[in-house]
Amino acid sequence: RIRNEPLIEITQIKGTSETHPLLSSRDEWADFELMEFRVGSPLYSQPKGSYAREALLNGLVFEQQGIANPYAFGFIGSSDTHTGASGVEEDDFVSKLGLLSATPEQRGSVPRGSLSLMGLFGPAANVEIDGENYASGAPPTFGASGLAGVWAEENTRDSIYKALSRKETFGTSGPRMRLRFFAGYDFAPDMLDRNDVVTVAYANGVPMGGELLARREQAPAFLLWALADTNSAPLQRLQVIKGWIDEAGQPREEVIDVACAGGVMPDPSSNRCPDNGATVDLNDCSFSAQTGEAELKVM
């Protein structure tokens, strides 16, 4: 399976499939852009068995039982629009279905008034909110997501597909940030200050998507490095989601902040960055531009 399906799409216009609050109750962002309905149906989906983090943990359980892990996936994001456009910007959203969801009225963003709107299979459904009629159905559940990040040696088809195959990839919900992640046992403490840090990390560790062979009685080091999208919000934190199997054979998960904006350290009791006052104005979606970083890196 991993040969044929090394990657899965962790986010797209029909929602983010990383995790769900019922599966990750201690993750305050587990509800990010979820589409909880079945495709083409108003019925709710069953969270269990539907999300990527749980699949990774289930794969570890299989390994613990001596069964080959079918869920050692890497991740990408993609749009899944049918328009030929990348609908990843909230302020320039082109939606998914061309003429069927081209206007704010069709997407249920503003009242439809007396307009007669068409959906995929006939007249669009309608819902009344505060005395106004809005289009319902699938378009109001769409989100402006996502993008695939690929670390290829060069911008050629052959090189990109080799990177996809080795899972040296990541997904974002739209921002064009750049993210590096390496693991190894022989990282020098001063690596982050070197101009050739990426070259040294490749030489002495494994990149995202790789497998690191465990050493007895020695913990690995992790190198994380993120650059913000210059046309989007600054970075607030770097997080690691740790998954493991406990002594009772049960899967466990922990969310750990490892780097915080402003040079502060995560709280050692909660493993969370302190609130730095960053806000989003829900009236116009503007954000605090001076409360984050253009770059975060840590080892």
Model regions and ranges:
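C-terminal functional module detector
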Residues: I2-M299
